[in-house]
From Swiss-Prot:
It is found in: Cytoplasm. GO terms for molecular function: ATP binding; ATP hydrolysis activity; four-way junction DNA binding; four-way junction helicase activity. Its EC number is 3.6.4.-. The RuvA-RuvB-RuvC complex processes Holliday junction (HJ) DNA during genetic recombination and DNA repair, while the RuvA-RuvB complex plays an important role in the rescue of blocked DNA replication forks via replication fork reversal (RFR). RuvA specifically binds to HJ cruciform DNA, conferring on it an open structure. The RuvB hexamer acts as an ATP-dependent pump, pulling dsDNA into and through the RuvAB complex. RuvB forms 2 homohexamers on either side of HJ DNA bound by 1 or 2 RuvA tetramers; 4 subunits per hexamer contact DNA at a time. GO terms for cellular component: cytoplasm; Holliday junction resolvase complex. It catalyses: ATP + H2O = ADP + phosphate + H(+). Disulfide bonds: none annotated. Residues 36-48 have a biased composition (Basic and acidic residues). GO terms for biological process: DNA recombination; DNA repair. ATP binds at residues 47-48, 89, 92-94, 155-157, 198, 208, 245. This is Holliday junction branch migration complex subunit RuvB. It comes from the Bacteria. Residues 209-279 are annotated as: Small ATPAse domain (RuvB-S).
């Protein structure tokens, strides 16, 4: 399998770097840090599972994709077009790379922001060979003209090119080989219906449970030559927000702490101490998560409040709140999205050390009445 990437640097499909990650410990020399990071980069690709068997978690998704791969191989055809959606960091890119290996085809990686002009997507399409996979991350951000070029490409395997302008314009069709388009998005509802309906298989990636993440951490620790015991892996997993990408990032930061403050081995006490230092609490909330909830409670009496007001008060943009912070806070029951706006749940109050107000039953009743009468 060959991987052909046209991603801009820092694209979402790449492992995310924490904007609030603490600086490297002062005791470690710059040379040591640079050497370690170079070694780490060599292992980055090796952390990705190579096939569906090695891919941890997402049991239902693996079963569906396993059938799709086996059926396509038996018929000698390419995979149908696929759309993966879910919060960032759950493995949408990794599973696409695995599908390319399973089908023994090339995969071309790009992101929607890199396809600003119609000729950008046209240039990728004409390079495809039979069976190739074209992976577009953040596909909900495709420009309208670019999206319209994909319609005949996905449905009829042809590229329609407009030659000339005005009354002299004419359309020339270029045949394309049968290929597979894989789209990845954190906002499936933002896709237009014509584009979404052209995907033959639409699958949601869910958050991972602690056991699944602990298994990923143990596996990746072995690949990175990190000594870790099961309680240590479980502690990191509990604070990883159900996300493998975050689990891998925390593993490396705890590794740093263990090397500087301990004997290099990650145990449960070492993991707890390290993650407290990095301000990741036992539920996986970092400083920004807690600030978001605290702002909701202190400035807006727990809500309900619109996301625009919450964004203005915290200095975050609405898209970041909706795509990065809200999914996990809602998953663990700390944030409620009602017809009236965002609300902090009683569990969020207790987690931050506040006494929950006595109004939740009344608000819940009002929302139920609104819902019954079709009000938004």
């Amino acid at each position: 399998m060959a991987i052909i990437s046209s991603r801009p640097s820092g694209a979402e499909g790449e492992p995310a770097k924490s904007r609030t990650a603490p600086a490297e410990p002062a005791q470690r020399s710059r040379t040591a840090v640079q050497s370690e990071r170079a070694h780490e980069d060599q292992h980055e690709e090796s952390l990705r599972p190579k096939n569906l068997v090695d891919y941890a978690g997402q049991k239902d998704l693996k079963a569906v994709l396993g059938i799709a791969v086996a059926a396509a191989k038996s018929r000698g055809e390419s995979l149908d077009h696929l759309l993966f959606y879910g919060p960032p960091g759950l493995g949408k890119t990794s599973i696409s790379l695995i599908l390319a290996r399973e089908m023994n085809v090339q995969i071309h990686l790009t992101t929607a922001p890199a396809l600003e002009r119609p000729r950008d997507i046209a240039g990728l399409l004409v390079k495809l060979r039979r069976g190739d996979i074209l992976f577009i991350d953040e596909i909900h951000r495709l420009p309208r003209l670019t999206e319209e070029i994909l319609y005949p490409a996905m449905e009829d395997y042809r590229l329609d090119i407009t030659i000339g302008k005005g009354q002299n314009a004419r359309i020339t069709s270029v045949p394309l080989p049968r290929f597979t388009l894989i789209g990845a998005t954190t906002r499936v509802g933002a896709l237009s219906s014509p584009l979404r309906d052209r995907f033959g298989l639409i699958q949601r990636l869910r958050f991972y449970d602690v056991e699944e993440l602990a298994g990923i951490i143990v596996r990746n620790a072995a690949l990175l030559n990190i000594s870790i015991d099961e309680p240590g892996a479980a502690e990191i997993a509990r604070r990883a927000r159900g996300t493998p990408r975050i689990a891998n990032r925390l593993l490396k930061r705890v590794r740093d702490y263990a090397q500087v403050e301990g004997d290099g081995r990650i145990t449960e006490p070492v993991a707890c101490a390290a993650l407290e230092l990095f301000e990741v609490d036992p539920r996986g909330l970092d400083w920004t998560d807690r600030r978001l909830l605290a702002t909701l409670i202190e400035h807006y009496n727990g809500g309900p409040v619109g996301v625009e007001s919450l964004a203005a008060a915290t200095g975050e943009d609405t898209q970041t709140i909706e795509e990065v912070y809200e999914p996990y806070l809602m998953q663990i029951g700390y944030l409620l999205r009602t017809a009236r706006g965002r609300m902090a749940s009683p569990a969020a109050y207790r987690h931050l050390g506040y006494a929950p107000p006595q109004r939740f039953e009344q608000v819940s009743l009002l929302d139920s009445i609104d819902s019954a009468h079709g009000r938004n």
